[in-house]
Design a protein with these regions (language model features):
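Acidic, proline/serine/threonine- and glycine-rich low-complexity intrinsically disordered segments
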Residues: 4-5, 212
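Conserved small/polar residues in nucleotide/adenosyl-binding loops
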Residues: 216-220
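Conserved short loop/turn motifs at secondary-structure junctions
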Residues: 13, 33-37, 61-66, 215
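Structured loop/turn residues at secondary-structure junctions
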Residues: 191, 214-215
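Short, well-structured beta-strand/strand-turn elements
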Residues: 51-64, 182-192
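Phosphate-handling DNA/RNA-contact segment within nucleic-acid enzymes
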Residues: 1, 13-20, 24-28, 69-209
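Non-catalytic interaction/clamp surfaces of large macromolecular machines
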Residues: 16-18, 23-59
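Active-site-adjacent loops and short helices of periplasmic peptidoglycan-processing enzymes
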Residues: 6-11
Length: 220
């Protein structure tokens, strides 16, 4: 009985921790979206509009913008009652040695990444300034986010796959640009190659996906 009780307690503890991570990511998503549509987000919004995206599409995918300051998101989440450890555990910030906690994403167009329950679990960020490192980065991996086990837009594409096969494309903007033109059955990996876990997800949803030649090399 003691073992059963311990297992139950561990399950409850893990469930509560994961729910907190999901809630933090949802709060971050709202913050990024609000910031994109503020006066400070005009350059990023123009970038997305110049890429041909409609305002409706931008809102549908909950695209956002991270501030250029190093603690914009941190301060917002703290004001909602989350502490620094919570924010770091959610993969949204990191702490350099002997320095304060800093936002992981700075001055980036933000792409929310959702699980099959349609909950935001992480973000991809596209840099608007080359001085902020790599062109694209993702949230750090967490208890609710493993980069090689998810696909961008899978939940939405799953609905369309009843009539059309899944189409695997390269990245976030490819998926969103297709959706902007009423093609809703596209998904994208969260890195440069498809993993076996991602392929299993694809085949679970669609028996005959359209797989580009560039993705026929799989990561072991």
């Amino acid at each position: 009985m003691q073992i059963t009780t311990n297992c139950l307690n561990q399950y409850i503890k893990s469930f509560i921790q994961k729910q907190k991570l999901l809630n933090i990511n949802e709060a971050a998503c709202k913050f990024f979206t609000k910031y994109l549509f503020s006066t400070k987000g005009s350059m990023a919004l123009n970038y997305l509009r110049d890429r041909g995206l409609s305002i409706d599409t931008i809102k549908e995918f909950k695209l956002g913008l991270s501030p250029s300051k190093s603690d914009g998101l941190i301060n917002s989440l703290k004001s909602e009652g989350y502490n620094e450890q919570d924010i770091e555990n959610a993969g949204l910030a990191y702490k350099p040695e002997n320095k304060p906690l800093v936002d992981r994403f700075k001055n980036r167009v933000m792409f929310p990444i959702s699980n099959l329950d349609n909950r935001v679990v992480a973000f991809g960020g596209r840099s608007l300034n080359t001085s902020y490192g790599a062109k694209y980065i993702n949230s750090a991996e967490t208890k609710v986010f493993k980069k090689g086990s998810l696909l961008f837009n899978l939940k939405r594409a799953q609905k369309s796959s009843k009539n059309d096969p899944l189409v695997i494309v390269e990245g976030y903007m490819d998926v969103i640009s297709l959706a902007n033109n009423s093609i809703n059955n596209a998904v994208a990996p969260l890195g440069t190659s498809l993993t076996k876990e991602q392929l299993q997800l694809i085949w679970r949803v669609c028996e005959e996906p359209i797989l580009p030649v560039s993705y026929t090399h799989l990561r072991a």
